[in-house]
Amino acid sequence: MIALSVNLNKIALIRNSRDTTNPNIPQHAQMCIDAGANGITVHPRPDQRHIRVTDCFDLASMLQVEFNIEGNPMTGPRKTERSDVEDYPGFMALAKEIRPTQCTLVPDGDGQLTSDHGFDLKQDGEQVARLVQELQSLGIRTSLFMDPDPEQIRLAAQTGTDRIELYTETYARAFRTGDDLEHVFQQFVRAAEVAVDEGLGLNAGHDLDLNNLPRFATIAGLREVSIGHHLTVDAIRMGLADAVAAYQRALGTG
């Protein structure tokens, strides 16, 4: 079975557009779980423009399913200018205090709108390996955000990480435009084969939707997808519970 982890960032972004607690993040997490989601994902950025530090603690206190926190493990503390928002403690400090089921490590910068590339482990491999070991010593499963590059995936295995998450934007774009789709899809098939051969668990995410997900879900070895933006958009017209159920069907598990 391929697990569906629902990313709540866009729901938090709606909340933060007003000075309010609506939509309530834990309540919407529970709605997703009740509808069949296998896990919950958040990506608290240093500016806390969507998910906030307090959301992470609120979710950790109530979740009985997999809790996946994404972020750059090299990002340190950040002060906030708002009196009603806690300072960002740094990714590793947050992970150590919460101890989620899984940490997905992502090499994003403060100024990025969204995650847009995987790790370059030729450059950062030694540092990433130390951070992976630090998280694993706390009982946290680790996953590295990676491009579908066999050489980089082999380097990921050398860090000792439990899993990788394939960055799927190039597949989603090729599916949308039709440009070189078969070639791009086979890149992901090959990347998955290398990951499995290296003993890595395989996750995937970014711009997966109800149209492109069924084909991607045929890739052997895929264990989990993390989906937020498109699921939230579909929830506007379908309702959240029906959207979660639709994504489970697209994975072949609903």
Where are these regions (language model features)?
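Conserved N-terminal beta1-alpha1 strand-loop-helix module at the mouth
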Residues: 1-69, 73-75, 79-86, 96-98, ...
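Hydrophobic faces of well-ordered beta-strands that scaffold small-molecule active sites
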Residues: 2-8, 40-42, 65-71, 101-105, ...
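Active-site beta-loop-alpha junctions enriched in small/polar residues
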Residues: 7-13, 45-47, 70-76, 108-110, ...
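Glycine-rich, proline-tolerant flexible connector loops at the mouths of alpha/beta enzymes
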Residues: 38-63, 107-120, 168-179, 235
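Alpha-helix-loop-beta-strand connector modules within alpha/beta enzyme cores
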Residues: 49-74, 121-143, 180-204, 210, ...
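Catalytic cores of alpha/beta
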Residues: 76-94, 149-159, 204, 208-222
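Histidine/lysine/aspartate-rich catalytic loop segments that bind and position anionic ligands
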Residues: 110, 141-194, 198
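C-terminal helical cap(s) of enzyme catalytic domains, especially alpha/beta-barrels
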Residues: 117, 176-181, 234-254
